[in-house]
UniProtKB/Swiss-Prot annotation:
InterPro entries referenced in this protein's UniProt entry, alphabetically: ACP_syn_III_C (IPR013747), ACP_syn_III_N (IPR013751), FabH (IPR004655), Thiolase-like (IPR016039)
Organism of this sequence: Caldanaerobacter subterraneus subsp. tengcongensis (strain DSM 15242 / JCM 11007 / NBRC 100824 / MB4)
Subunit structure: Homodimer.
GO biological process: fatty acid biosynthetic process
Domain notes: The last Arg residue of the ACP-binding site is essential for the weak association between ACP/AcpP and FabH.
Protein's pathway: Lipid metabolism; fatty acid biosynthesis
GO cellular component: cytoplasm
Locations listed in the record: Cytoplasm
Protein name stated in the entry: Beta-ketoacyl-[acyl-carrier-protein] synthase III
Gene: fabH
Length: 331
């Protein structure tokens, strides 16, 4: 009987733009304060991409670092998945642009649009291709340039988001390690709570849509907050049960970096100590699909994750969507 192929993470990488926008900078732009932002979100600063940088540029840099960490060449890749809500353009996909940038011409390439849940969705997709034996090396990227779709006059949203990219190479690992399970979900009835109205077939771009700022993020903050608190709980418990694990088995929780109050509520329900929860939103804000990918790479490179550790990732996002995964670290 053939032994089941285990799919895990071979390498990680991340990239953050150089420009830092602090809460004090935002005080000069909109009616807000450092105290207000910090108290309600935990965010102190965020990174902003240069006007010349597109999402694919950030994704490419993160990918190079992930490939180096995995000791692989671009031509070793069989597939590239980019999770983003800020693609370079409607088509071709940002993944195809990254493929060309890397010279990974043996790889299939496509984008997924799952909001902040995108990177974990991508890991789950990659896991299936590797475990079935169809592909050996799949590059999963979460990348965003949210600064380009923010209404900088809307103090309720412009303080929340930042730019960045994270990447992971998913491939074969030793039996018993790797991605142990995933849980993905969606509730399309909540799509109205977090969306960008214009630019698609429902509302094509026009002078009117531009003048009305309809190419920017619209969010019902309270509705998203209530959804997030509920789903962070259910998604973590569900994926742990699927893997036959309990909260006591978690060595590191890597949550979507949206709001410290949401993360703290999840930490308390799981009864985890602070050192078992990785948080970097104070530095980067909410980077949507890049959030979990960047945090995972940072935690690994800081030595906070070691071989055999049980890593729980969880996210929620536009759609509305949610995703969680359990990884037994193999590096």
């Amino acid at each position: 009987m053939c032994e089941k192929i285990a799919a895990g993470i071979l390498g990680t990488g991340s990239y953050l733009p150089e420009k830092i926008l602090t809460n004090f900078d935002l005080e000069k732009m909109v009616d807000t304060s450092d105290e207000w932002i910090t108290t309600r979100t935990g965010i102190k600063e965020r990174r902003i991409a240069d006007p010349s940088q597109a999402t694919s540029d950030l994704a490419t840099e993160a990918s190079k670092r992930a490939l180096e960490d995995a000791n692989l060449k671009p031509e070793d890749l069989d597939m590239i998945i980019v999770a983003t809500v800020t693609p370079d353009m409607n088509f071709p996909s940002t993944a195809c642009i990254v493929q060309a940038n890397l010279g990974a011409l043996n790889a299939a390439a496509f984008d997924i649009s799952v909001g902040c849940s995108g990177f974990i969705y991508g890991l789950a997709i990659a896991q299936q291709f590797v475990e079935t034996g169809m592909y050996r090396n799949v590059l999963v990227i979460g990348a965003e340039t949210l600064s380009k779709i923010i209404n900088w006059k809307d103090r309720n949203t412009c303080v929340l988001f930042g730019d960045g990219a994270g990447a992971a190479v998913v491939g074969r690992v030793e039996s018993g390690y790797g991605i142990l399970g995933s849980y993905l979900g969606a509730d399309g009835t909540g799509g109205k709570y977090l969306y960008m109205p214009a630019g698609g077939s429902r509302m094509p771009a026009s002078h009117e849509t531009v003048e009305k700022n309809l190419h920017t993020i619209f969010m019902e903050g309270q509705e998203v907050f209530k959804f997030a608190v509920k789903v962070m709980d259910s998604a973590t418990i569900e994926v742990l049960e699927r893997c036959g694990l309990t909260p006591e088995d978690i060595d590191m929780l890597i949550p979507h970096q949206a709001n410290t109050r949401i993360i703290e509520a999840a930490r308390k329900r799981l009864k985890l100590t602070n050192d078992k929860v990785y948080i970097n939103l104070d530095k980067y804000g909410n980077t949507s699909a890049a959030s979990v990918a960047i945090a995972l790479d940072e935690a690994y490179r800081k030595g906070l994750i070691k071989k055999g550790d049980i890593i729980l990732t969880v996210a929620f996002g536009a759609g509305l969507t949610w995703a969680s995964s359990v990884i037994k670290w193999s590096k």
